[in-house]
């Protein structure tokens, strides 16, 4: 296996230079890359599926189309040209929906998760990553008494939030649609980038944006079974999330500084909750939605309602299947004399996130700006006298939804949201049942890291295949379904493994007692997503940052920093989403076993964006010079300029897994004046390279390492294909007299081991 990995890495370094110069907006022009956005805005899709009988491309910007199979087993098609925007798509392989395994970008969802293609065009769009000051997006866990468990939400804070520590900000509660998760307005709606750009242009006020999960009943089956539904979302929002936000963020606690809105079901929830809580909200936004026309004490007193609302904004596409309902609702408001703003789009493919992003760009400039919102309300809406409740409508009037049949019906709901499958379903005995709907399949198998080989599944009612598994050891395991030879992630599991390539699902088997990686009832830190300007590559890049419970940018307390690097094909999200480093640190800190620290998780692979921009024609995973330059000259200075951190080497650590371990050794051992803790987890470093790195200056001399390092750590599983390589590295350290610690547990090249590595190392850092 060691020889195999070395061969793979070397082969990539040799072959990838043959990639042609990338086209504008596209990925590298290699035969199987996908998607490729060509110079004329056509898009080429490729899928390696040599055994498939049929492959169809299903993209939001075009009708479904049959792909053509080449002699090498690659299925291909070129569509377009396409109007610049971000579009979801997937492949249908012999009738089974499949993500694009070459595309790192996916659409978070409770159901099937499409891939996304970004057609950028010649000019940056409203949602583009521009070189402007960026806000942060925090992933937070709050205790919900309503639900009896921890809820999830995302919170955007504007660029000046951490600097202007005496400033308070207005808040916009922004809710996504049916089957969407709390991440969608961030990862698909790009709300943070749209607002960053508008703020930089002076077109919008700075504000906090809160993204709740619109379907809290789905958190666990126990919640569905034990809580009386009612307005579960509204109760959680009012009684739990809003108090959490106002206790943990500097908000202006006044109705004139609160807005609520959303897309699709989220628009319905936002309007319904906002209109029945006008003592708390004065800005209401509905994107591709509508709500009840019978809300008490709202519509029949137009004068009072109008006085309470600063902005009532309604937007919908004329080709949206909800256009009829949305138009009916807007006309109802007009008849009732309720002031509102209406905007209708065409050519954005209906009920889509292209519309949702556009609507944000139109409403952000109006929020918390009474002059602008009043101008919009006055210009767009003619205030009409309310009709008496018993006065009939004019004879010619026919509701829009009846005229054009664009309305929500039980039949349409059933077609859009067929009966779901719960998978995985966890049981009290520690097992879980995995299920997938595949009525036409001949053979379905389960593949997972919790067992060897493949497990055959059994077909049951409605064409649902199932199997129940109990692993030997409770843990978090990646898994997939193999349907007639086609591998797919579990379409009913929201938990997915972030990766530049194929993305497996994640199954979390809990032990009877909470483990170090579990979310426990302790003080929680936050994981924030933000952007920094890279001097090494010349454009803005993403980074994840964990700050411990109690961290306050307004406080004078400073913290040590761990720079934590992911492995090959992983992303900057993997240590958070799979490694669970935030939960591990929360629990260790709460028990007094680890020092409170900040953890920085950079994206260690700049090549995809460099190739896209024409700055590179190859990806060289073996090279560590670029990543070392990136970490030392861009990431570390950004953190030390923007966070309350200790800036001496005794308070800096660097660690990484696999390829990230290789990069950690080069950056850490090569810069002993910057890092005094260097920890490599199953590093992708090979025998001949170790001595060469000491001789060519990649690593500092052994005497200097011993003199300056507080900890050099090496760990690897005894079944890991890099185990022998790690033993060679340890032997080299011993021969050079480098003091170090080791950890060699059982297990392979897995994130189960990674979680154990970081748990052990975190207890040794900064002590």
Stretches found by the model and what they are:
Residues 1-24:
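Bacterial Sec-dependent N-terminal signal peptides
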Residues 21-25, 31-32, 37-65, 69-416, ...:
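Non-catalytic cap/lid and distal C-terminal segments of serine-dependent acyl enzymes
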């Amino acid at each position: 296996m060691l020889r195999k990995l070395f061969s793979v890495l070397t082969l990539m370094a040799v072959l990838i230079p043959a990639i042609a110069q990338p086209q504008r907006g596209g990925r590298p022009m290699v035969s199987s890359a996908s998607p490729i956005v060509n110079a004329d805005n056509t898009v080429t899709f490729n899928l390696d599926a040599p055994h498939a009988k049929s492959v169809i491309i299903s993209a939001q910007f075009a009708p479904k189309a049959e792909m053509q199979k080449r002699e090498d087993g690659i299925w291909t098609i070129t569509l377009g040209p396409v109007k610049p925007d971000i579009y979801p798509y997937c492949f249908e392989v012999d009738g089974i929906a499949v993500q694009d395994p070459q595309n790192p970008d996916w659409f978070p969802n409770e159901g099937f998760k499409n891939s996304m293609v970004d057609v950028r065009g010649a000019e940056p769009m409203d949602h583009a990553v521009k070189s402007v000051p960026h806000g942060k997006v925090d992933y937070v866990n709050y205790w919900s008494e309503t639900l009896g468990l921890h809820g999830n939400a995302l919170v955007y804070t504007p660029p000046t939030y951490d600097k202007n520590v005496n400033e308070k900000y207005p808040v916009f509660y922004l809710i996504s649609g049916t089957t969407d998760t709390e991440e969608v307005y961030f990862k698909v709606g790009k709300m943070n980038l749209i607002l960053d750009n508008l703020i930089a242009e002076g077109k919008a006020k700075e504000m906090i944006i809160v993204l709740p999960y619109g379907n809290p009943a789905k958190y666990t089956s126990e919640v569905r079974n034990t809580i009386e539904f009612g307005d579960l979302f509204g109760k959680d929002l009012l009684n739990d999330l809003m108090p959490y936000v106002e206790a943990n963020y500097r908000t202006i606690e006044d109705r004139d500084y609160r807005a609520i809105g959303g897309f699709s079901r989220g628009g319905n929830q936002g309007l319904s909750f906002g209109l029945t809580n006008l003592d708390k909200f004065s800005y209401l936004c509905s994107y591709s939605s509508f709500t009840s026309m019978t809300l008490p004490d709202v519509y029949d007193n137009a004068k009072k309602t109008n006085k309470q609302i600063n902005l009532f904004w309604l937007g919908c596409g004329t080709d949206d299947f909800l256009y009829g309902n949305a138009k009916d609702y807007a006309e109802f408001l007009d008849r009732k004399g309720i002031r509102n703003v209406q905007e209708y789009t065409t050519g954005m493919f209906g009920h889509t996130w292209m519309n949702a992003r556009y609507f944000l760009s139109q409403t952000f400039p109006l929020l918390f700006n009474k002059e602008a919102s009043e101008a919009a309300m006055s210009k767009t809406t003619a205030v009409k006298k309310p009709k008496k409740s018993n006065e009939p409508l004019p004879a010619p009037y026919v509701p829009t939804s009846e005229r054009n049949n664009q309305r929500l019906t039980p039949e349409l709901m059933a077609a859009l949201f067929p009966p779901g499958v719960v998978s995985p379903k966890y049981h009290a005995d520690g097992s879980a049942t995995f299920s997938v709907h595949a009525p036409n399949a001949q053979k379905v198998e389960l593949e997972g890291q919790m067992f060897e080989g493949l497990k055959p599944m059994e077909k049951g009612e409605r064409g649902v295949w199932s199997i129940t598994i109990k692993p030997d050891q409770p843990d978090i395991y990646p898994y997939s379904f193999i349907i007639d030879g086609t591998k797919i992630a579990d379409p009913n599991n929201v938990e997915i493994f972030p990766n530049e390539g194929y993305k497996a699902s994640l199954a979390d088997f809990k032990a009877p007692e909470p483990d170090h990686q579990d979310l426990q009832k302790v003080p929680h830190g936050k994981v924030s997503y933000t952007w920094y300007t890279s001097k090494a590559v010349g454009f803005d890049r993403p980074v994840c940052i964990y700050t411990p419970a109690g961290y306050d940018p307004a406080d004078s307390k400073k913290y040590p920093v761990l720079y934590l690097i992911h492995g090959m094909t992983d992303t900057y999200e993997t240590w958070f989403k799979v490694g669970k480093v935030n939960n591990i640190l929360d629990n260790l800190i709460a028990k007094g076993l680890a020092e409170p620290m900040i953890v920085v998780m950079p994206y260690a692979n700049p090549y995809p964006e460099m190739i896209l921009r024409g700055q590179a024609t190859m990806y060289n995973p073996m090279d560590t010079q670029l990543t070392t330059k990136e970490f030392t000259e861009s990431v570390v200075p950004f953190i030390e300029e923007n966070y309350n951190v200790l800036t001496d080497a005794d308070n800096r650590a660097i660690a990484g897994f696999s390829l990230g371990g290789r990069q950690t050794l080069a950056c850490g051992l090569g810069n002993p004046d910057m890092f005094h803790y260097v920890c490599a987890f199953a590093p992708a470093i090979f025998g001949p390279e170790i001595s060469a790195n000491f001789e060519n200056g990649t690593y500092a001399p052994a005497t200097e390492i011993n003199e300056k390092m507080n900890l050099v750590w090496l760990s690897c599983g005894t079944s890991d294909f890099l185990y022998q390589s790690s033993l060679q590295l340890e032997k080299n350290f011993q021969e050079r007299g480098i003091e170090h610690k080791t950890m060699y547990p059982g297990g392979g090249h897995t994130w189960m081991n990674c979680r154990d590595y970081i748990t052990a190392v975190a207890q040794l850092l900064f002590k």
